[in-house]
From Swiss-Prot:
It comes from Helicobacter pylori (strain ATCC 700392 / 26695) (Campylobacter pylori). SUPFAM superfamilies: Flavoproteins. Coiled coil: none annotated. Disulfide bonds: none annotated. Its cofactor is FMN. It comes from the Bacteria. This is Flavodoxin.
Length: 164
């Protein structure tokens, strides 16, 4: 398995902590802060995991917004991509974890893996749901932090084969 690039953007530190947990669980990965990343660095990986918190009511975190603006759909075309979104399903029930939706819109030009069921979450709506599943792993550190490690473990097992 080639090295996986795990790219994250964060304001509170939660997305970085999740990226580190995923790196530890999956092994052979490099964790990269998008605030310091370059397009060339991104394009040096064929396998990436993109970890993005949701800002406010469904917006993409600022560092991700800036970095995503430097990338084209073609930058994703030859990649295998896992998406991980963070959100607060209680406070932002109608836009839960929509930060990853904005990335998914470009990432779907490549091979997106790791869709997960919405079971166990309580929210009204989310653009991050397609075909009844989240477009990636969704973490709620505000309300369900006790489930984070188990969700990461299950998701890593699910996607490992796709990253082989």
């Amino acid at each position: 398995m080639g090295k996986i690039g795990i790219f994250f953007g964060t304001d509170s530190g939660n997305a970085e902590a999740i990226a580190e947990k995923i790196s530890k669980a999956i092994g052979n990965a490099e964790v990269v802060d998008v605030a310091k990343a370059s397009k060339e660095q991104f394009n040096s990986f064929t396998k990436v995991i993109l970890v993005a918190p949701t800002a406010g009511a469904g917006d993409l975190q600022t560092d991700w917004e800036d970095f995503l603006g430097t990338l084209e759909a073609s930058d994703f075309a030859t990649k295998t991509i896992g998406l991980v979104g963070l959100g607060d399903q209680d406070t932002y029930s109608e836009t839960f974890a929509e930060g990853i939706f904005h990335i998914y819109e470009k990432a779907k030009a490549g091979k997106v893996v790791g869709q997960t069921p919405t079971d166990g979450y309580h929210f009204e709506a989310s653009k991050a749901v397609e075909g009844g599943k989240f477009v990636g792993l969704v973490i709620d550190e505000d309300n369900q932090d006790d489930l984070t490690d188990e969700r990461i473990s299950k998701w890593v097992e699910q996607v490992k084969g796709s990253f082989a």
